[in-house]
Structures are given as structure tokens and as C-alpha cells.
Amino acid sequence: FLKYFNPISNRRSSIIDTGMIHNKIYVGTSGWNYDHWRGVFYPEKYPRSKWLEFYSGEFKTVEVNATFYRSMKPETFDNWRKRTPETFSWSVKASRFITHVKRLKDASEPMQKFMKPLTMLGEKLGVILFQLPPSLVFDEDVLENFCRCLPENKRCTFEARHSSWLQENALLSFKRHNIAWCISDTAGRYPFREAVTSDFIYIRLHGSRKLYASEYTEEELKTWAEKIRRWNRDTFVYFDNDFMG
């Protein structure tokens, strides 16, 4: 994917030349601990206990989805931090208790609880992803109140799955708080808009034709690279089409 930015780019690189300034481009996957990746991405006999080290030798970032389903101990994040290179970046999905149970309301205490163990990642914490339920309709007051609960100086992105979030008021709220609108390719299932609302870009590629299970063609990857070049910001790109590794 990075080869489309300049001739000397490779998968291990996280810096590209946009032609104007140097921006960081982080490319990774949504998770790394998949059984069906053995023999496809990971060598057949490579020990599972070393998969993270192998992964972080190939990619500069990963998106953690397990935190959406359950809380994790600080020791887990500390372990991950120690096992990855200094330049590695972790993006972490927020708890579904915040997004799907509380639905962004009265979220101050849950946010503090969620963030506390994440501090163990230190400077390797990249972006906090809030994946909203398809039934959650945009409410400006709810969003503004929730934004007051967000940690200072931490990058956040919202993946909205209801069409009401496409309206300008929602995007203006994101801009006010420097929150990235998650540009999410979901094979047409959920709202799609290439909106730039912060000083960084966050892209989730779930599959262009079949959700979670379709590969991206060379032409599609080239098109995405051209868009990223044009947006000219730090960018996080995660592939969530993990069916065949």
C-alpha cells in the first residue's frame, strides 16, 4: 500500500513525502491474533507467543478491538508496549458500555475507567476509536456533553453508523473538538463520507464489495493512496477484511 506514496516506501516505513511536508502514515490491521493467519501471514511453525513481535516487525500500528467487548488490565497494555518498537502506534476501540449501553450519555466515569489502563501504553497510544451503534441518532447536545469527557491531548475518532451523522452540524462539532470523522468503507452497509474534520485522518477498510471478506484491488489501493496524499495529514489506515489474512 505504501509503495503508492513514493518509490522508496515499503511496509516498514511510517513516513511518506506528500510533496509538501512529511506526514506520518500508519498502516495496519484490526487485530493481529487470528488463528487463520497461521501459514498465511505468520509462518506455519512460528510460536503464537511471538506473533505480536512478528506483526510489529511488518507494520507500524494495530487497531485493538478486544477492548470494545471487555476491560483489560494495565499489565496487558504495559506488556504490549514493551514488546513493540518505539515507533509503534496502538489505536484502541472504546468500550461498548460507553457507546452502546450509555450511548454517549453520562459517560464521564466510564471514560475515566476506560482510559486508566490505557496510560500504560504511554506515547504509543495513537487514536481512540468510538464505534457507534447503527441505531444511535445524532444529537448535538449529547455529542457536545460527551466531548467534555474526552481525554485532553488524545486523538479520537468516531465511526458513525446512522445516516443522521452525515449532517453538517455533526461534522462541525467534530471540527470544534479536533475529532476525526472515521472514513469507513463498509461495502455500502453504513454511511460513507470522505469528511476531514481534524488534523489527522482515520480510515477503516472493512471491504469494498463484501464486508470483512473482500480484498482490495491494486487500483483501489492506488486510489486510496491518492486521496491520502491530497488530504495531506497524519493518517491511520486499518484493514478489517481479515477473512483470508
Predicted regions and their residues:
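Residues lining hydrophobic/aromatic ligand-binding pockets adjacent to catalytic sites
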Residues: D17-G245
